[in-house]
Swiss-Prot record:
The gene is fabZ. Disulfide bonds: none annotated. It is found in: Cytoplasm. Keywords: Cytoplasm, Lipid A biosynthesis, Lipid biosynthesis, Lipid metabolism, Lyase. Involved in unsaturated fatty acids biosynthesis. Catalyzes the dehydration of short chain beta-hydroxyacyl-ACPs and long chain saturated and unsaturated beta-hydroxyacyl-ACPs. It holds the Pfam family FabA. This is 3-hydroxyacyl-[acyl-carrier-protein] dehydratase FabZ. Its EC number is 4.2.1.59. One of its GO terms (biological process) is fatty acid biosynthetic process. The keyword Lipid biosynthesis applies. Coiled coil: none annotated. Belongs to the thioester dehydratase family. FabZ subfamily. It catalyses: a (3R)-hydroxyacyl-[ACP] = a (2E)-enoyl-[ACP] + H2O.
């Protein structure tokens, strides 16, 4: 799924759309996305000008967006909004820099009454950059 398809599902837009492409999806079960991290990312202007590092919270947000794509493709959740309710066991293991390609792998653990629990792993090559357990609720509005 290319960027145009992602924009049909997610409400996020530049500069906060953090997924460039979906390379694998099993509706309601898993999704794998790609974020090509470029030197032109707006967050690098201040984080940090002489030592650019992608903020960890944005890596987690990118994982959440991939999870949202896996869930928002389900008929009952189309057009709904996913809002974070929690992040557990989040760990940052590798610095992500301009030129890196983040592979964002998300497994959906459960969906009950609109509450989604998922596990995410962000990798650069074979190295794990971040892991997190994500929880969000599917809702009509924010």
């Amino acid at each position: 799924m290319e960027n145009k398809g992602i924009r049909k599902i997610l409400p996020h837009r530049y500069p906060f759309l953090l997924v460039d492409r979906i390379i694998e999806i099993e509706e309601g079960k898993k999704a794998v996305g790609i974020k090509n991290v470029t030197a032109n990312e707006p967050f690098f202007q201040g984080h940090f000008p002489d030592n650019p590092i992608m903020p960890g919270v944005l890596i987690v947000e990118a994982l959440a967006q991939v999870a949202g794509i896996a869930v928002m493709n389900i008929e009952e959740f189309k057009g709904k909004l996913g809002l974070f309710t929690g992040i557990d066991k989040c760990r940052f293991k590798k610095v992500v820099r301009p030129g890196d390609q983040l592979v964002l792998e998300v497994l959906i653990d459960s969906i009950k009454m609109g509450l989604v629990k998922a596990k995410g792993v962000a990798k650069v090559g074979d190295e794990v950059a971040a892991t997190a357990e994500l929880m969000f609720i599917m809702t009509e509005e924010g």
